[in-house]
Amino acid sequence: METKYLKINTADNVAVAIVALPAGEKLIVDGKEIILNEDIPAGHKFALKDFTEGENVIKYGYPIGHTRTVKKQGDWINENNIQTNLAGLLEYTYNPAEVDLNIPHKDLTFKGYRRKNGDVGVRNEIWIVPTVGCVNGIVNQLAEGLRRETEGKGVDAIMAFPHNYGCSQLGDDHENTKKILRDMVLHPNAGAVLVVGLGCENNQPDIFREFLGDYDSDRVKFMVTQKVGDEYEEGMKLLRELYAKASKDERVDVPLSELRVGLKCGGSDGFSGITANPLLGMFSDFLIAQGGTSVLTEVPEMFGAETILMNRCRNKELFEETVKLINDFKEYFLSHGEPVGENPSPGNKAGGISTLEDKALGCTQKCGKSYVDGVLPYGERLKVKGLNLLSAPGNDLVAATALASCGCHMVLFTTGRGTPFGTYVPTMKISTNSALAKNKPGWIDFNAGVILENEPMEKTCERFIDYIIRVASGEFVNNEKKGYKEIAIFKTGVTL
């Protein structure tokens, strides 16, 4: 029998249409007949009771906003008749939650690259990283030259990562650029890196070299284009040296405890919090139980669900760091005259997400139910295993770049609307619905929509774990197959 709706939590006063439902449809919800007063698109909400004006709408067991007007049982609840409860800064109280997941440990491994410093990569690529946007054309030309010369053999990829920054920046923007580029150069998915500078930029190559700290000088080379005659010939000479090293690297067995994944969603819809995001949450809990690491970001998309994360902080210090994480981003919004609750995009709303709380309560499903063990500022690298929260905005390119830069080997990206992009680590797309997976097989890597078709979440997660291990061991995801790899750096200040 086809499932037509889902009431997510027993406390909810709305349900979600699994399929498009016509006006006049009769449904039995908790033993009570509900007659729909209007057409309800798939992924959208309908009222299970009569609402007075200003009454809270409950989904996932929490308020997602309040009604703007009186609504009747069977009415369509959407962004036109529900309003966010979010306002400015809040004071929070630590009410620690008990976490007892009881997930068995399995001795699972993947095939990765063990680096000289003991770290592990899931890819062995050669990267060309510009210190400043002025040399973007050069790094692109060098990457193409090495690909042509080697026919792309011997390493997983040869990529240049152009960006707009590295000069005409001050303060935090300049530091953010340096941090993200440093994190790239030191990332274990790179078997070798050529750093290309101009020579007169704010992000001075010599200072940036010191900023890197310890690095393998056999695997990281520098070229300052103003100091060489023919930058292409000099760059190719250095790349040949790097290729000779990287192309000899081989995969070895690595325990799953060394895997680090970023958790991301974009182009979300009303099914995100029902299928793909809970699937990631189940996987995240499993990975952490094996000793691994997952990272949740998109701080503005935590607004409205932040107390769930705060109360899962392992101690008071982490709770206070999480409060700062949330309120710093709220202050960033307010300092620019922007309301903290204006997040859902047109695509989100078309897909059934009405308010930021609606989005946040679905978004935070991605990190499961584990304790929070770490909180990271933007641009900083992981220090502890387990579940970490990372400061970065919701923008897909900026957030995914930040996840890669903190040390994640891959980004697990759920989507209900679809997106082709990838950051500089494998960016796996998990669809919330089967229609998207069928329509965009060149974008979607794994379909969580089968959960709506009565496949048990546990079975889907077993298949997902197997797929993650295959990808960590070298199987390419779609963004890699197509060469869709790019970076975006968070900018908050002026440009000179």
Placement of each model-derived feature along the sequence:
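Metallocofactor- and cofactor-centric catalytic cores in central/energy metabolism, strongly enriched
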Residues: 1-410, 417-420, 425-496
